[in-house]
């Protein structure tokens, strides 16, 4: 596991978003960042074993491990390769704090293991839901679970005593940032029982920028010039725009009773100790973005 970057279980995404900032990573392997990123998935099948070695190293200080921060660790490929149960078991075995960010409903497959982990260490979960507009979802996030299904994940996790926040990302300029759209999204997040909501405006890094702008030109050509102006200075929307979105979402979160800047609070839940999920009678555990850490800052564990 490379220092300060974690292990890469998969690179590329079978559950594609036209704006995905991780597209650039495919170029490091001389692969296409457009269609290639969507269809050519590179899998590190020995990720659980590599993690176990890293956690057992005398140099490891129990740093918080953040998963899903580059590409989704619960994308479709995980259904086939089943790497997360072994990874979660390794973290639970060492009582190592961790977090997971995901758009995937497959996290519920590992619910038991997540609960078991939460008994011995700090575990947090965050689900990414940038908007609830189904038409926008169909065009900009093809292959991902519908926003309502992701909110059902939040509802299920919180129903089992596992605090789950929502990363409201991306807020897409001129397509998903109208006041009524923001209100509808925050209202739905609150109804799902999220412990927090954190807005993040769309950012367009190299690789993602070219792919997104091509998509925009095809589906919303009248917005191309506006985007060129808004993102003229780089990958990120201007500070004034980010502040406006953050203020609006925080006000709505307060109105609906959500703590907008609190991380999802980890829970410790009494549960019998797990068996190794790689054994025939092993149990799978729950997964989710976690908060809480030990030692220095979080170490990124990129699985997919």
Feature map (PLM): residue ranges:
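Auxiliary Fe-S-binding modules of radical SAM enzymes
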Residues: 1, 174-304
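Conserved Radical SAM active-site core
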Residues: 1-10, 18-126, 130-138, 147-151
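Amphipathic alpha-helical segments that form well-ordered structural scaffolds
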Residues: 50, 90, 156, 244, ...
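A structural motif
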Residues: 95-96, 162, 194
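Surface-exposed amphipathic alpha-helices with a cationic face
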Residues: 115-118, 154-159, 250, 254
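Conserved strand-turn element in the central/C-terminal portion of the radical SAM core barrel
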Residues: 132-134, 141-143, 156-178, 202-204
């Amino acid at each position: 596991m490379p220092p300060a970057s974690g292990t890469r279980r998969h690179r590329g995404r079978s559950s594609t978003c036209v704006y995905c900032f991780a597209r650039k990573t495919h170029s490091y392997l001389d692969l296409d960042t457009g269609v290639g990123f969507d269809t050519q998935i590179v899998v590190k099948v020995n990720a659980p074993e590599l993690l176990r070695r890293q956690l057992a190293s005398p140099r490891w200080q129990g740093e918080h491990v953040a998963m899903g921060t580059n590409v989704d660790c619960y994308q479709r490929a995980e259904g086939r390769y089943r790497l997360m149960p072994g990874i979660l078991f390794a973290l639970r075995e060492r009582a190592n704090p961790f977090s997971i960010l995901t758009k995937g409903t497959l996290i519920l497959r590992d619910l038991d293991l997540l609960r078991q982990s939460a008994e011995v260490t700090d575990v947090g979960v965050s689900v990414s839901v940038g908007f609830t507009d189904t038409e926008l979802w169909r065009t900009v996030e093809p292959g991902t679970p519908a926003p309502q299904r992701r909110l059902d994940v939040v509802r299920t996790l919180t129903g089992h005593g596992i605090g789950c926040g929502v990363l409201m990302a991306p807020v897409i300029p001129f397509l998903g940032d109208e006041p009524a759209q923001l209100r509808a999204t925050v209202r739905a997040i609150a109804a799902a029982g999220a412990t927090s909501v954190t807005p993040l405006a769309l950012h367009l890094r190299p690789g993602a920028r070219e792919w997104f702008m091509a998509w925009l030109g095809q589906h919303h050509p009248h917005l191309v010039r506006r985007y060129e102006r808004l993102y003229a200075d780089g990958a990120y929307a201007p500070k004034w725009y980010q502040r406006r979105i953050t203020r609006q979402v925080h006000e709505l979160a307060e109105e609906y009773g959500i703590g907008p800047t609190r991380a999802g609070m980890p829970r410790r839940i009494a549960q019998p100790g797990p068996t190794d999920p790689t054994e025939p009678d092993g149990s799978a555990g729950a997964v989710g973005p976690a908060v809480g850490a030990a030692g220095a800052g979080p170490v990124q564990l990129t699985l997919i």
